[in-house]
């Protein structure tokens, strides 16, 4: 149930907030898409941990690149 609310929040961000900020994600898929896929595949706890780990790598000193959900 709460998974659905988190997924809706991510989709809201992708649709309405992200376009205003521009494309700055250094990873593919984007961090928000990665979070969406991870939570859908593994549930809120494990998927949320994967998404958090990914967000911690999203900074100018990380090379970025292709990083799919395991």
Swiss-Prot record:
Keywords: Cell membrane, Membrane. It is a peripheral membrane protein. GO terms for cellular component: plasma membrane. Pfam families: YidD. It is found in: Cell membrane. Transmembrane segments: none annotated. The keyword Signal does not apply. Belongs to the UPF0161 family. Could be involved in insertion of integral membrane proteins into the membrane. NCBIfam families: membrane protein insertion efficiency factor YidD (TIGR00278). This is Putative membrane protein insertion efficiency factor.
């Amino acid at each position: 149930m709460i998974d659905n609310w988190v997924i809706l929040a991510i989709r809201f961000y992708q649709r309405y907030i992200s376009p205003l900020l521009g494309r700055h994600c250094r990873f593919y898929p984007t961090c928000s898409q990665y979070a969406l896929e991870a939570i859908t595949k593994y549930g809120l706890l494990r998927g949320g941990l994967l998404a958090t780990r990914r967000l911690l790598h999203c900074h100018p000193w990380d090379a970025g690149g292709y990083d799919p959900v395991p």
